[in-house]
């Protein structure tokens, strides 16, 4: 059975709405004195017939991910001193999140943001609404302001 006092998990993909999820998760983690676990999923499902091309695509995705993490770290350090761990994992976001929640007993909450462009809410939001998880899931509106996130968390 999962404890509800575990760390906060957030999955980033470089979209504007993931910044809302990161801010909320960082603020909540800091207030709860828990770790923020940041996952970046590299979905290398694109098949190529040439191994060298596939390797180059993966290397480029990993390099872009490292840049994304550096930007995220700089952003978070501007408003929080939360302890953060990062993992770069290969596969679909849904499979990765499922595996982490199933296998890591220290994860207590999943924080995600919904797509704010009026399209689908996002693959994780859709998946969760159909199947659910064994831990609480917080879905943040993708277009919520930083001030509103801070107010929601209880900072202001």
How would you name each of these model-derived features?
Residues 3-52:
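Small/aliphatic-rich secondary-structure junction motif
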Residues 21-27, 96-100, 124-127:
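A short acidic, amphipathic alpha-helical/loop segment
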Residues 24, 60-72, 96:
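Short, solvent-exposed amphipathic alpha-helices that sit
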Residues 40-67, 149-155:
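Acidic, proline/glycine-rich short linear motifs
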Residues 77-85:
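A short helix-to-beta-strand connector/capping loop
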Residues 88-96:
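Charged docking surfaces used in two-component/phosphorelay signaling
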Residues 103-156:
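Gly/Ser-rich helix-loop-strand patches that form or flank binding pockets
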């Amino acid at each position: 059975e999962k404890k509800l006092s575990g760390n906060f998990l957030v999955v980033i993909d470089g979209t504007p709405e993931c910044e809302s999820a990161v801010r909320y998760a960082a603020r909540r983690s800091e207030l709860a004195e828990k770790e923020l676990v940041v996952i970046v999923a590299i979905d290398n499902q694109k098949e190529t017939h040439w191994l060298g091309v596939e390797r180059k695509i993966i290397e480029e995705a990993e390099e872009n991910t490292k840049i994304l993490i550096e930007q995220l770290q700089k952003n978070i350090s501007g408003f929080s001193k939360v302890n953060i761990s990062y993992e770069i994992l290969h596969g679909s976001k849904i499979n990765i999140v499922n595996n982490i929640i199933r296998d890591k007993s220290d994860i207590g909450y999943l924080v995600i943001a919904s797509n704010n462009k009026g399209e689908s809410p996002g693959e994780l939001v859709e998946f969760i609404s159909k199947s659910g998880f064994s831990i609480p899931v917080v879905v943040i509106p993708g277009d919520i302001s930083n001030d509103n996130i801070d107010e929601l968390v209880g900072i202001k």
